[in-house]
Amino acid sequence: SKDWVGKKVIMDFGGTVFVGVATMVGLHRSGGTHGNIKVTGYSSTFLLESDHTCASWCNKSLSDIVKELTDKAGVQALVNPETKSKLEYECQYEETNFRFIQRLARQYQEWLYYDGQNLVFGKPQAGSTTKLTYGEELSVLDVCSQTLARPIKGSSYHSVNDQTYNGQSPDTAAGQNTLGQAAFDSSLALFTAPAIQRAEPRITNKGELDAYFQRKQQSDSAASNFITGESDCRILKVGSIIDVHTAIHTGIGIHVKNSIGTYIITEITHVAGMGDSYQNYFTALPSSIPTLPCPDVP
């Protein structure tokens, strides 16, 4: 088993495949003469966990930069960001390659996740939808709303043309379902004074600044409505679109199934046991949201 360290690992849950890298192997013994081999690893994005490094790019697009890094590391990636324009200048400073990609996703409010086989940068095309019904595939279901939306405004100075641009959030929900819209409106009713912030990316005109504050507010409030659940459906993964139904008891032996909406899975934990035992725990956001919550990076 010593030769397993650093090798590719393919895990098949009978419907979902996860590709990763074994980073640690150990022998575990307890209470007898027998023992177990314990393998620890990460997704293939571990190959982007270089030591802290520095680099810079001029007049390159986000796609160009991310593809360059993933290609060098040998990481399969689906790169299609909404930000298409070339960037005047972008710098990686004392960061791992993965942390730098996370920061780019945060700066430009782009989608970023690992679907089990590919690093996805940019909102993916909608795939097939899986129907999940509470009481059938779903054993636990929680539907939640929270007050996340805040008004924001700020400015950005462009030194080349000596211009200061001012902008603010539109304070309108985009892509939220009924529950998310209600939570968004309630939050803005609570927080009426705009926070003053600076734009993280380089801004060259007022249109870019307005778009930045719009997408930042969308990202900050993306989880205004979310669900968590437990299921035995083996085909689920991060990025899966699910149509969630719940059955309402209307009489003796009578149940009416209603859809509470379509969601995209953003977190999932797979638990596979002995034999055919399997269960997963997931969190999902409305599938129509334009951006994900920001990665927690500086």
Region locations from a protein language model:
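Amphipathic alpha-helical and helix-coil boundary elements used as assembly
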Residues: 1-298
